[in-house]
Design a protein with these regions (language model features):
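Multi-pass alpha-helical transmembrane bundles in non-GPCR membrane proteins
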Residues: 1-193
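Conserved small/polar residues in nucleotide/adenosyl-binding loops
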Residues: 194-200
Length: 200
């Protein structure tokens, strides 16, 4: 008989606490960056940081609440959809500071990349809320594609930023891609366990 495989209580608590730590760090560093932007009267930088904070906090808050809920809660499945949708916002938000500042005056690179990642975020949110599967290759590929999209503007970025900033941007993209791949492999493992249990 087929049965649903859930994360253990300890795994869910760890996920909830780790993501709540992201909320705290996001608020602390976000406040520091916003204060700097206001002091410098950098309007575009302020907009970029705000979008980044919205995406990051949306991701961490929804994930914290989702993992903190009991598996029997009627809200668990609803929060799972928002948890997935928030990942798109987190990635798009990460691109906002560089596209609205460094790349904004580099021809079509800034607004083109900004429009692309936020369009992906909007479409991804709609897809997640309408019909979210336990595992979706399209979702995983979209996460990876958004993470790699910075490569199309790598030349103007390299011409405008110091090497230390480039390293941070590349590292962030690698983290997104690695996270998406691990998430995909983990879901495949649970799906194979479900099929095995269903045959017993």
């Amino acid at each position: 008989m087929k049965r649903k495989i859930f994360y253990s209580h300890k795994e869910e608590l760890w996920n909830a606490w780790s993501h709540s730590g992201g909320i705290v760090l996001g608020i602390v560093f976000g406040t520091i960056f916003l204060v700097w932007c206001f002091q410098e009267r950098a309007g575009w930088a302020t907009a970029g940081v705000i979008l980044y904070l919205v995406g990051m906090l949306f991701s961490y808050v929804s994930s914290t609440v989702y993992h903190a809920l009991s598996a029997r809660s009627v809200w668990k499945e609803r929060l799972r959809k928002w948890d997935h949708a928030a990942i798109y916002w987190h990635i798009a938000g990460s691109y906002s500071p560089i596209t609205l500042t460094v790349l904004r005056n580099q021809g079509a690179w800034g607004w083109g990349l900004f429009s692309f990642v936020w369009l992906c975020a909007i479409l991804g949110t709609i897809s997640s809320l309408r019909k979210l599967r336990d595992h979706s290759n399209l979702e995983t590929l979209t996460f990876i594609g958004m993470g790699l999209s910075v490569l199309v503007a790598f030349k103007p970025l390299a011409d405008s930023l110091p090497i230390s900033s480039i390293i941070w941007i590349v590292a962030e993209g690698v983290m997104y891609i690695t996270g998406a791949l691990f998430y995909s492999l983990n879901k495949r493992r649970y799906r194979s366990e479900e099929r095995r249990v269903g045959k017993e």
